[in-house]
Amino acid sequence: MIDEVLLDAEEKMEKAVTVARDDFATIRTGRANPGMFQRVVIDYYGTPTPITQVAGINVPEARMVVIKPYESNQLKAIEDAIRNSDLGLNPSNDGSIIRVAIPQLTEERRRELVKQAKGKGEDAKVTLRNIRRKANDELNRIKKDGEAGEDEVGRAEKDLDKTTAQYVSQIDELVKHKEGELLEV
């Protein structure tokens, strides 16, 4: 029972770190990266669909992204979705592909993005702490119901704290890495 609680908590924490990693990939760094388009969505035959699923995205140069839709009738929708997204990019449509030049980030914009990255990191840490709290509540319930002894539950709580600290440090590493990427000129 205790092992199940710990395993469940660890799986949820792993998922939270994966979500945070995906969130960080969407923050623009001034370098071309196909991951920055993961959250850009178009209306594809009535269904909201990420453009990464309706087009091939290539990075021929460090500051250029080329998007080639699988269906040419989606060109305008993809172009509009990129233009209207919060990425601050201006795509150009040449009739068969969309080119997106990635402009150099200003110092002020870099600072904003660092702040945004730290906020996402903090949100991920809150998620990890909530997972730990729920697991601790479950462990206390097990102890209260007499399904496990106090020593076993105490050891499990220490293991849970160690696991939480490990995942929090992974989030800190992700934030530090993203901050370094953003501030690199």
Curated annotation (Swiss-Prot):
Q: Which Gene3D superfamilies match?
A: 3.30.1360.40, Ribosome-recycling factor
> Which keywords are on file for this protein?
Cytoplasm, Protein biosynthesis
**BP GO terms, sorted:** translational termination
Q: Name one GO cellular component term.
A: cytoplasm
- Check the record and name the Pfam families matching this protein: RRF
Single Gene Ontology MF annotation = ribosomal large subunit binding
Compartment(s) of residence: Cytoplasm
InterPro entries given for it? Ribosome_recyc_fac (IPR002661), Ribosome_recyc_fac_dom (IPR023584), RRF_sf (IPR036191)
Functionally, this protein is described as follows:
Responsible for the release of ribosomes from messenger RNA at the termination of protein biosynthesis. May increase the efficiency of translation by recycling ribosomes from one round of translation to another.
Q: Which family does it belong to?
A: Belongs to the RRF family.
Matching entries from PANTHER family are given as:
MITOCHONDRIAL RIBOSOME RECYCLING FACTOR PSEUDO 1, RIBOSOME RECYCLING FACTOR
> What's this protein's name?
Ribosome-recycling factor
State the species of origin: Mycobacteroides abscessus (strain ATCC 19977 / DSM 44196 / CCUG 20993 / CIP 104536 / JCM 13569 / NCTC 13031 / TMC 1543 / L948)
